[in-house]
Amino acid sequence: IFIFIIYSLIAVLWSSDKIFALEYVKKYYHFLIIPIIFTSLKKEYIDKVFSTFLLGMLISEITSYGIFFELWTKEGISPNDPSPFMDHSNYSTYLAFTVFILMYKIIYTDDFKWKIAYSIFFLFSTSNLFLNGGRTGQFSFLIALCLIGFLNFKNKLKAVVLFISLGTTIFVSAYNLSPVFKDRFDYFLHDVEVMINEKDFSNSFSLRVALWISGLEASKHNLIFGSGIGDERENANYILQKFNISNDNFKQETENSIDFHNMYVQYIVQLGIVGLIIILLIFYLLFKLDIRDKVYKNLLIIFLILYFCHSMLGNSFHINQSM
């Protein structure tokens, strides 16, 4: 991660707006907590960290349900999308990770009373995941659920069938019981349909697809080292014009900047193949961490799957609520 930050600082040298580029890199400050955790966190405290995280999520979920049932209000938050303390994409991803932590708590906790408590919390969290409008976390959750069988089952075929069945059951239940999830999923299907049939890239998902295609095309002009931070628009404009996308759809703090709503596209444009390789190495090295405790190793892999999927729909390294 620190090699990535150093390389980003070097990339400021070939960025046209160096003040903006430095401000952009400065937002990676939240990673400074990593060496503190690495040097200070003892193994016996890890479970307490997870418990504290779950407590924080419980508070968020109670607040979310209160907004949904209109027991209380929060400025700028609609009952139709009750994500109380962060945007729904990040909140839904946190909820997805919460559900998996609770799943392991239920399996490995011996105390029957705690099993019941965790089971109720599990249902509480799963319902909340599909009540809010964050499709990112919802689909990341379903993908991770299908892959999790490989972590614990020797019979891989049986595991895949079991977890795909479970994922399908959760999806069908959410579609029929959650108006928010049903509306957003129907809108997603409509968006894809008009994108394919009418070449209309003006809606939520199709706009992202247009940005991804434009970014990949733009990256070819500075493939090795990238165009620099804040200069993403330089080679993407003519592609965006083909999709009839106006500048209002991606206004940023500097004239030449674009948020491609995909971390991998963003960094291959900004930092080239070199930057993208560094990003992928971060995931690989985290995956290869020598964690002997099976539960923590599985949770790490689940976390990486969720984070990888989340990053496909947003620049997750560059937000203060980054996981």
Predicted features along the sequence, with ranges:
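A membrane-periplasm/extracellular boundary helix in multi-pass inner-membrane enzymes
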Residues: 152-198, 213-221, 229, 238
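Membrane-interface micro-motifs in multi-pass membrane enzymes
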Residues: 23-26, 83-98, 135-137, 260-263, ...
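Long extracytoplasmic/lumenal interhelical loops at the membrane interface
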Residues: 198-217, 221, 225-271
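Alpha-helical transmembrane segments of multi-pass inner-membrane proteins
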Residues: 9-10, 45-76, 86-154, 162-163, ...
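Active-site-proximal inter-transmembrane loops
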Residues: 72-89, 123, 248-262, 267
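Aromatic-anchored transmembrane helix interface
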Residues: 2-4, 18-41, 52, 57, ...
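Membrane-interface helix caps and helix-loop-helix hairpins in membrane proteins
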Residues: 13-23, 130-132, 312-318
